[in-house]
Amino acid sequence: MDNQTVAAIWSCASATCLSLDAKRHSVETNTNDRQAPPGLSNSNNNNNNNKSTAVDADPRKLRHIAHTPRGSCFMALLLLLLLALNFRHAHSCGPGRGLGRRRERNLYPLVLKQTVPNLSEYMSGASGPIEGVIQRDSPNFKDLVPNYNRDIIFRDEEGTGADRLMSKRCREKLNTLSYSVMNEWPGVRLLVTESWDEDHQHGQESLHYEGRAVTIATSDRDQSKYGMLARLAVEAGFDWVSYVSRRHIYCSVKSDSSPFISHVHGCFTPESTALLESGAKKPLSELAIGDRVLSMNGKGQAVYSEVILFMDRNLEQMQNFVQLHTDSGAVLTVTPAHLITVWQPEREALDFVFADRVEELNYVLVHDATGELRPHRVIRVSSVRSRGVVAPLTREGTIVVDSVAASCYAVISSQSLAHWGLAPMRLLYTLQSWMPAKGQLRTAQDKSTPKDATAQQQNGLHWYANALYKVKDYVLPQSWRHD
């Protein structure tokens, strides 16, 4: 929005306020006439008519009306509307200059022997480690839950109902997948050929023994559908999916008690660095509110943006991270639920993808020596456990960390929705920056206090981010969340 547009809107807002208050003044005058005693009616009517005419004619009184409490209220409301119009939501266009437009997302089927993510099933970035076999007399048997979803066919060859038993997380993902199958192929239902196994018919380290794995197919046994079935399983939220055989798909999930699930938000490591506008690199643990760091705008171009708050900051917490290694040598370390910018060359568009769903041969945006963000191939995906989490939020909603472009958001798959969800915090930061007293106080503090003291004051999850995380389970569909 340019300055001329802002000036035009502001002029219209001022004129509207004056008109509304003049009308209110006229209505109040007429009300007083109706309430006056009979003996004074005629004289008061004449006087009030003269006053009304004066209001319409005298610009000094018009200016006075604009400063009445009601006029100030209207002016404040219109100012807020003007600010809202000035907000820009996040787009996903091509990186650099003019490299395409965002299109609808298409789902691509998996190929035979492909796994998502491309990690060992037992790594923390996938379904996680084995916890132990569950028998009917095991204390953990009570943690298994039956699945009576009528949209799912359970083969149950044993006749004991064992195939209906599974972990809570597995049941949740399986139910989500069943809806996707019916939407994709009307009249076809999801077929579960194996779930919890008590007869030890699988390998020694199978997650079937814990109720954390299912073997699935479609009810029509059409093998041409299985590649897309595997993709739908990935979209449903299974933590590890394998197109293991032409006859079926294998899926598994993390343990219900995994601490990896409890940490729902997304962060970077404290040792990761951001590039300041001055050209210096700064560890995220030392980053402060007000620092201008390298980010990405809605056109996929490199820009500098202010840090307005920290979504989370805890330098002592142990956490599992995903590491994305690129062919340029850049390595990004981030929590699995964090959104990463992934370039889709076949569609010439950018997608925001959860870090644990980025695969080898995908392209991410890397800040290179030319000063621009360019696509580079991911050559390896690994996992690591480290201490400390830091999640800065910039005004753009993106940040370049260790030379790799990433979102500031996590947990939900929509970058635009997450960016709008934080609009109140951006507005609050803007209003605070306009306050002279606040600016003078900040200037005085800068002379006597290290700049990173702002960041040092916070330890833990920001109250607003925490509120959004709690609300998301009630207002967002499961397919939009990283669960």
Curated annotation (Swiss-Prot):
Tell me, what is an example of a GO biological process annotation in this record?
cell-cell signaling
- The EC class name is hydrolase
Spell out where lipidation (N-palmitoyl cysteine) occurs.
93
Q: What InterPro entries does the annotation carry? A: Hedgehog, Hedgehog_Hint, Hedgehog_sig/DD-Pept_Zn-bd_sf, Hedgehog_Signaling, Hedgehog_signalling_dom, Hint_dom_C, Hint_dom_N, Hint_dom_sf
Residues that bind Ca(2+) 1: 157-158, 163, 193-194
GO CC, sorted alphabetically, is: cytoplasm; extracellular space; nucleus; plasma membrane
Locate the compositionally biased regions of type Low complexity: 41-50
Annotated residues that bind Ca(2+) 2 are located at 158, 194, 197, 199
Signal peptide coordinates: 1-19
Hey, where's the site called Essential for auto-cleavage on this chain? Answer: 338
Report residue numbers covered by any propeptide: 20-92
Q: At the top level of its lineage, which domain of life is listed? A: Eukaryota
> What are the entry keywords?
Autocatalytic cleavage, Calcium, Cell membrane, Cytoplasm, Developmental protein, Hydrolase, Lipoprotein, Membrane, Metal-binding, Morphogen, Nucleus, Palmitate, Protease, Segmentation polarity protein, Signal, Transferase
| Quaternary structure note | Interacts with shf.
Can you say what this protein is called? Protein hedgehog
Q: Which gene encodes it?
A: hh
